[in-house]
């Protein structure tokens, strides 16, 4: 006897995340964006600052571009849409051209 009637092994099966898998970035393709975001969060003491949210957007865009997550609308991720005429440029793209 198991000592715990009514339990089954199927109840112990892990369930996948609600929005699908979130693969690790084994090749470090988006590490730079992640580190910039984390550094920003540290500077603002983990407050929800807009400049950090825009860095998070750059990080998520990198993950989408490298097939590390599915493409999704920014509004579904709680982030502002790209400005018209921005052509999907990131903050880093804009500052790298200076």
Swiss-Prot record:
Motif Cx9C motif 1 per record, residues: 30-40
Major location category of this protein: cytoplasm
S-S bonds: 30-62, 40-52
Keywords (A to Z) from UniProt: Cytoplasm, Disulfide bond, Mitochondrion
Top-level taxon of the source organism: Eukaryota
CHCH domain boundaries: 27-70
Region called Disordered, residue ranges: 1-25, 76-98
One Gene Ontology term, aspect cellular component: mitochondrial intermembrane space
Protein name: Cytochrome c oxidase assembly protein COX19
Position of sequence motif Cx9C motif 2: 52-62
Record's function text: Required for the assembly of mitochondrial cytochrome c oxidase.
Biased composition (Polar residues): 1-10
């Amino acid at each position: 006897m198991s000592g715990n009637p009514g339990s089954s092994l199927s109840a112990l099966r892990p369930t996948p995340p609600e929005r699908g898998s979130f693969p690790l970035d084994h090749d470090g393709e988006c590490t730079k964006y992640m580190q910039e975001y984390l550094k920003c969060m540290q500077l603002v003491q983990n407050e929800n600052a807009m400049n950090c949210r825009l860095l998070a957007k750059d990080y998520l865009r990198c993950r989408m571009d490298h097939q590390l997550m599915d493409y999704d609308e920014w509004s579904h991720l709680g982030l502002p849409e790209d400005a018209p005429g921005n052509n999907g440029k990131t903050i880093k793209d804009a500052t790298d051209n200076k």
